[in-house]
Regions:
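Short pre-active-site segment immediately N-terminal to the catalytic Zn-binding motif
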Residues: 13-18, 22-38, 79
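Metalloprotease/metallohydrolase-associated module, dominated by Zn2+-dependent proteases
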Residues: 2-15, 55-109
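Short charge-dense sequence patches
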Residues: 8, 34-44
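Nuclease and nuclease-like effector domains acting on nucleic acids or nucleotide cofactors
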Residues: 1, 35, 51
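Catalytic Zn2+-binding segment of zinc metalloproteases
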Residues: 42-59
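Short, solvent-exposed loop/turn segments at secondary-structure junctions
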Residues: 9, 29-30, 52-53
């Protein structure tokens, strides 16, 4: 997983974003200081690979829009995306990604 520090991506208020398996962060030192950040983004990298990279964003947007239509706020809709749910729920589980089953995010649908 490649990590790139810059001042543009991600948007303010977010520490990191994973785009096609490349993690962009505003503060590399802060990102690296917490293993949960790394595990969260690495989970997304594995999800990208499972969905052949091009499938990740359509799946992500589908669930976000579906959640918005259910009346959720933008932030609630984001947190209820199955891809995000897996990453958040497991980010504090050491070695989770070493034993993770493919398409594990589907159990959060």
């Amino acid at each position: 997983m490649r990590i790139v520090e810059n001042k543009i991506i991600p948007f303010r208020g977010y520490l990191a974003i994973n785009i096609f398996g490349i993690v962009f962060t505003r503060d590399l030192r802060k990102f690296n200081s917490n293993q949960a950040n790394f595990r969260h983004e690495y989970t997304h990298t594995l999800q990208y690979k499972e969905l052949w990279y091009i499938g990740f964003i359509p799946v992500y947007l589908y669930y976000w829009i579906k959640n918005l239509f259910k009346g959720m706020s933008a932030h609630q809709a984001y947190r209820r995306i199955p891809l995000e749910m897996e990453a958040y729920i497991t980010e504090n589980v050491e070695r989770y990604n070493e034993h993770r089953k493919k398409f594990a995010w589907k159990k959060y649908r």
